[in-house]
Amino acid sequence: MKQIAELLAPAGSVETMYAAFAAGADAVYIGGSRFGARAYADNAESESLLDAIDYAHLHGKKLYLTVNTLLKEQEMNELYEYLLPFYCQGLDAVIVQDFGVFRRVREWFPDLAIHASTQMIMSGELSAEKLKELGATRIVTPRELSLNEIRSIHKSCDLEIESFVHGALCYCYSGQCLFSSIAGGRSGNRGRCAQPCRMAYSVEQNGKVILPQQKGYILSPKDLCTIEILPQL
């Protein structure tokens, strides 16, 4: 039996969640006040998120919480206290990058669905099979994968597969970029990316400018747009 795909949208705030659901999204992923990959976004506070979970369920929708950064060892106990209220409220799934977080969530909340973030760089069949073995219910494929690579993973493993179909692209492999850390001391894997790849740069060769800075967005890829291959996806 052919399944209908879930339309999932990012929600940078609770207000954005309302708009996404009104526009037809089946689910949203949203960051809270801690441990998300968008530390400088208008993230929801805990009370607002608890209300958002209720709102989603009241309207037959789902809400997934992002914990898609690398955590320090001393933050693990704080993570438990952070997640517990959302779990008790009926959170549908948590999206994780860190394998340590993955293990702890599995131990603390055995029945909570875990989605393996694109930041985990799950790029092949063996990775998918291992994540299933560990207890993942869904894998989010890296934006770098081709349609054939996604198809191959789907054929080899019966995990749910989530793929981005529109939006910005990083110039580096998902979860592997250190540019922001090196250039500005802000780690993308801690949710603090300064996005230096979006800045303009000049290109010089032998002391001569061959591409002026005002035309030099050389590290900023064009946005992902898969509308022409949505039927195949």
Predicted feature locations:
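Active-site loop and adjoining helix of the penicillin-binding protein/serine DD-peptidase-beta-lactamase fold
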Residues: E144
